[in-house]
Amino acid sequence: MQAIKCVVVGDGAVGKTCLLISYTTNAFPGEYIPTVFDNYSANVMVDAKPINLGLWDTAGQEDYDRLRPLSYPQTDVFLICFSLVNPASFENVRAKWFPEVRHHCPSVPIILVGTKLDLRDDKQTIEKLKDKKLTPITYPQGLAMAKEIAAVKYLECSALTQKGLKTVFDEAIRSVLCPVVRGPKRHKCALL
């Protein structure tokens, strides 16, 4: 069985842990608990191939900036996550997460993931954003960011409703099984 290491990064509270727990247990977790590191493992079938998907959660908070890259070696694919209802987390894809991932792993495929899809059309959430003169991130904005950072895919999902959730991980696996070759040959991440 082929093993694939998938590392999930993004700002604190964008829903990385919920994404992983909802996917691996089919249940949405309760309270927000900041993550230091957690690993999940899932045996899945994608395109009739059995895969052992190793899922690595990371802490988005700045306190962990020096610790987080320790989970990067041998990564096969990164999920860079942002919340569709948190424009600052979207900007940090460009400002922080893409540069960090590319610095440590120059050729590992990236999938850009917009989380909390269920809240994009939520009236209360829209009002809260409006009070701050903000709006949710749109699908075209996400696509444009994915193109800018040369992500292999842009996907949106909800860990709460599970809409689009399985697709995120299926596409992460496909990005490793069927790589889109862009420029130099892809190598696994190695820290020197």
UniProtKB/Swiss-Prot annotation:
Record-level Gene Ontology MF annotations: GTP binding; GTPase activity; protein kinase binding
UniProt-annotated binding residues for GTP: 10-17, 57-61, 115-118
GO cellular component: cell projection; cytoplasmic vesicle; cytoskeleton; plasma membrane
Pro-peptide positions on chain: 190-192
SUPFAM superfamilies attached to this UniProt entry: P-loop containing nucleoside triphosphate hydrolases
Membrane topology: Lipid-anchor
InterPro entries linked to this entry: P-loop_NTPase (IPR027417), Small_GTP-bd (IPR005225), Small_GTPase (IPR001806), Small_GTPase_Rho (IPR003578)
Domain of life: Eukaryota
Gene3D superfamilies (UniProt xref): P-loop containing nucleotide triphosphate hydrolases
PANTHER family for the chain: RHO FAMILY GTPASE
Entry protein name: Ras-related protein Rac2
Source organism: Drosophila melanogaster
Gene name, Swiss-Prot/TrEMBL: Rac2
